[in-house]
Amino acid sequence: RLDHSHVAEGLTFLGLQGMMDPPRPEAIVSVRQCQRAGIAVKMITGDHLITARAIAGQIGLKGHEEHGQLVALSGRELEKVSDEKLPAVAERTAVFARVAPEQKLRLVRALQSRGHVVAMTGDGVNDAPALKQADIGVAMGISGTDVAKGAAAMILTDDNFASIEAAV
């Protein structure tokens, strides 16, 4: 069994690398335009909650705030929310991080139960159930899997959120 004492000495720090994948500038503008038009934009991501909040800030995502921060939930927190409470929670939450495929489907259904018309974007096999359930499932045409494209009502040929805003 390997523990800290086995590697505590004789090591040399070689370096640290950071990577960043910033949002596209046109996505930032499109999110703002959608919000101005009264569309509640929500982000469901596989990223860590802290990363998701940072991206939400970069793209100007608006929504309810608690303690000066945008309301955001992790998949672990979301799984504890009852079906009865989920519609209200889904409405007031702007960011969902580390969400499982079945949770995406629950979110779509919860918003629809409140009378919302739900558009859902996705690119993977895991997105297919939510894409199919959404009023408008939107698959990525370049990076999307065939399963996601088959489940969607619309395919974004350029994988660009701005195209959704233009279509609206």
Spans of model-derived segments:
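Cytosolic catalytic headpieces and adjacent flexible linkers of membrane translocases
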Residues: 1-110, 114, 128, 134-136, ...
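Hydrophobic "anchor" residues on beta-strands that sit immediately upstream
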Residues: 43, 118-119, 123
